[in-house]
Curated annotation (Swiss-Prot):
The gene is atpB2. GO terms for molecular function: ATP binding; proton-transporting ATP synthase activity, rotational mechanism. The keyword Membrane applies. This is A-type ATP synthase subunit B 2. Keywords: ATP synthesis, Cell membrane, Hydrogen ion transport, Ion transport, Membrane, Transport. Has multiple subunits with at least A(3), B(3), C, D, E, F, H, I and proteolipid K(x). It is a peripheral membrane protein. It holds the Pfam family ATP-synt_VA_C. GO terms for cellular component: plasma membrane. InterPro entries: ATP-synt_VA_C, ATPase_F1/V1/A1_a/bsu_N, ATPase_F1/V1/A1_a/bsu_nucl-bd, P-loop_NTPase, V-ATPase_su_B/beta. The lineage of its organism: Archaea, Methanobacteriati, Methanobacteriota, Stenosarchaea group, Methanomicrobia. It is found in: Cell membrane. Component of the A-type ATP synthase that produces ATP from ADP in the presence of a proton gradient across the membrane. The B chain is a regulatory subunit. HAMAP family: ATP_synth_B_arch.
Length: 466
């Protein structure tokens, strides 16, 4: 992230320091969102941004943290510019810190452009409808909650669930079907541990996926305030790759709960009136400025698809972070602790999951003609099997009919064979084939959500071993 201008204004009127914020008295001719350099007595320079301005006070957030800042001898230099990020096609394959500085020991990014990390608002009329299928290689997503190019589809996880493994698997495997497609991944990690960072680096390097990944890494011991800039820097890089170099970019943001906690910390330091669970009342608007930067633009070949990942505290889907995220985004993938305890990997709970744009990315010429019918039948059969499990807990399995026992068996096989796949990548054809193999547990007359022509065509192939 860069700053600077030929004309700058300096102040030595720092009033006091509170958390990641400093308060500067009597500022003049400065603007909201402007960057600042904080110069310490030993010459160390830190980067900040104006959060709030009143007649007498400017509130500046310091990205590197405020430790060591003495309000009496610290100089603040306002630059007259918004925070900028150096962007280049050569960012692919690089590991950067939360504000875009090299973290891999490599050279500085030689910029093709310097862009405002806040992005530019997109005219709604210029947006194009998401339409193309993105294959993640994960059956529970590809078949039941299809990811469409230009969509924002979050993953709701719980503490200790393998969300990081799922994120790494998606980053390695995601592709747009068809030859000649330029595809890249921008991966932004916020507040993760060294162990988690090492896991991601190892996964990307061993698979060779690092060559097409831009990695923004903010560790748990990095300044909390830096997390506010990390997703915006990542999306700025994604917009440059998508709209300048015509790449189809998948942006993975993890963990958005850490981002929101940083937002709460800043709000507390500013002594704002808290909202639900202490989060600021403007958190919905703030999250929207991140999530709404996904999509496609008419006349542009490139696109941005988002997968935000967040941790639900106490597995509570009504917590403000998943709750507000669900309002803004176009569906959700929910990880289940019960499935995780059963050894199902990935532990995706199909029933509360949703992809609102799924129908735009499936069907003939995109996936396969029977995709919608197969997904509907899988949902219906699995939901009935889950209901029967609760009934069995009361009356016992002996009270069930033979057909009901088949549905129980279907639910078990659905979890163990369809949902659970470990690190194995499945094509959409393989995923649909596994689904048809599961349907062999049920008689034809129970496949009420599938057209007869598809039953005749695909069930015959399974029976014949085709």
């Amino acid at each position: 992230m860069q700053h600077g201008s030929l004309i700058t204004v300096e102040y030595q009127t720092v009033n006091y320091v509170s958390g990641p914020l400093i308060f500067v008295e009597r500022p003049k001719e400065i603007s909201f969102g402007e960057t600042a350099q904080i110069i310490l007595p030993d010459g160390e320079a830190r980067t900040g941004q104006i959060l709030d301005i009143s007649e007498d006070i400017a509130v500046v957030q310091v990205f590197e943290g405020t430790r060591g800042i003495d309000s009496h001898v610290t100089t603040v230099r306002f630059t007259g510019q918004s925070p900028l990020l150096d962007v280049s096609y050569d960012m692919l394959g690089r590991v950067l810190d939360g504000v875009g500085r090299p973290r891999d020991g490599g050279p500085e990014i030689i910029p093709e452009a310097r862009l405002d990390i806040a992005g530019m608002p997109i005219n709604p009329y210029s947006r194009d409808k998401p339409a193309e299928f993105i294959q993640t290689g994960i059956s529970a997503i590809d078949a039941l909650n299809t990811l469409v190019r230009g969509q924002k589809l979050p993953i709701f996880s719980g503490a200790g669930l393998p969300a990081n493994q799922l994120a790494a698997q998606i980053a390695k495997q995601a592709k747009v079907l068809g030859e000649g497609e330029n595809f890249a991944v921008v991966f932004a990690a916020m507040g993760i541990t060294y162990k988690e960072a090492s896991f991601f680096m190892k996964e990307f390097e061993e698979s060779g996926a690092l060559e097409r990944v831009v990695f923004f890494l903010n560790l748990a011991d990095d300044p909390t305030i830096e997390r506010i800039a990390t997703p915006r820097c990542a999306l700025t890089a994604a917009e440059f790759l998508a709209y300048t170099h015509n790449l189809h970019v998948l942006v993975i943001l993890t963990d958005m709960t850490n981002y929101c906690d940083a937002l709460r910390e800043i709000s507390t330091a500013r002594e704002e009136i808290p909202g639900r669970r202490g989060y600021p009342g403007y958190m919905y608007t703030d999250l929207a400025t991140i999530y709404e930067r996904a999509g496609r633009i008419k006349g542009c070949t490139g696109s941005i698809t988002q997968i935000p990942i967040l941790t639900m505290p106490d597995d509570d889907i009504t917590h403000p972070v998943p709750d507000l995220t669900g309002y803004i985004t176009e569906g959700q993938i929910v990880l289940s602790r019960d499935l995780f305890r059963k050894g199902i990997n990935p532990p995706i709970d199909a029933l509360p999951c949703l992809s609102r744009l799924m129908n735009l990315g499936i069907g003939p010429g995109k996936t396969r003609e029977d995709h919608r019918n197969v997904a509907d039948q899988l949902y219906a059969s699995y939901a009935y099997g889950r209901d029967l499990r609760r009934l069995v807990a009361i009356v016992g399995e002996e009270a069930l009919s033979e057909l009901d026992r088949n549905y129980l068996k279907f639910a078990d096989h659905f979890e163990k064979r369809f949902i659970s796949q470990g690190n194995v990548e499945r094509s959409i054809e393989t995923t649909l084939q596994v689904a048809w193999e599961l349907f062999s547990l049920l008689p034809d007359e129970e496949l009420k959500r599938i057209k007869e022509e598809y039953i005749d065509k695909y069930r015959t192939l399974i029976i014949s071993g085709g």
